[in-house]
Amino acid sequence: MTGLERQLTEMLDAPVAASGYELVGLEFIRAGEHSTLRIYIDSPNGINVDDCSEVSHQVSAVMDVEDPISVAYNLEVSSPGLERPLFKAEHYQQFIGHEVSIVLKMAVGNRRKWKGDIQSIEGETVKVLVEGQEEEFVLSNIAKANLIPKF
């Protein structure tokens, strides 16, 4: 998570929670004039288009006042979906036993991309069973992690 993403998460967590939703996480993708702020929300009852619209309006109001992003961007609000992104230690705990795809910031054993089943989370270290071998990844070294849906 970048400094900006951390700042945005802190800024938006309370307004999203006040609306009755969990701020699962967010991503800011820089692409010049086509940058995107993608916000993932969830609730015990799931998420529909009206929920996304409500949160989008609330987030827009906060962003207009705080103005933390200096470039033009598109705001996207969505559910985490089947390939749910994992941002926090609690997310890994919630999905122990599920298959995950992990991309690291810095390679471990000459690899940046890993797939396996989440075994446990201890502090800031997640243990993943990869091809019969348990691997450990520090959360701060994980660039991106998503659940792999089972059909």
From Swiss-Prot:
Lineage: superkingdom: Bacteria
InterPro entries in UniProt: Ribosome_maturation_RimP, RimP_C, RimP_C_sf, RimP_N, RimP_N_sf
Signal peptide start and end residues: none
A biological-process GO annotation: translation
Subcellular location: Cytoplasm
Pfam families: DUF150_C (PF17384), RimP_N (PF02576)
One Gene Ontology cellular component: cytosol
The entry's keywords: Cytoplasm, Ribosome biogenesis
PANTHER family, A to Z: RIBOSOME MATURATION FACTOR RIMP
Function (record text): Required for maturation of 30S ribosomal subunits.
Name of the protein this chain belongs to: Ribosome maturation factor RimP
Gene, per the UniProt record: rimP
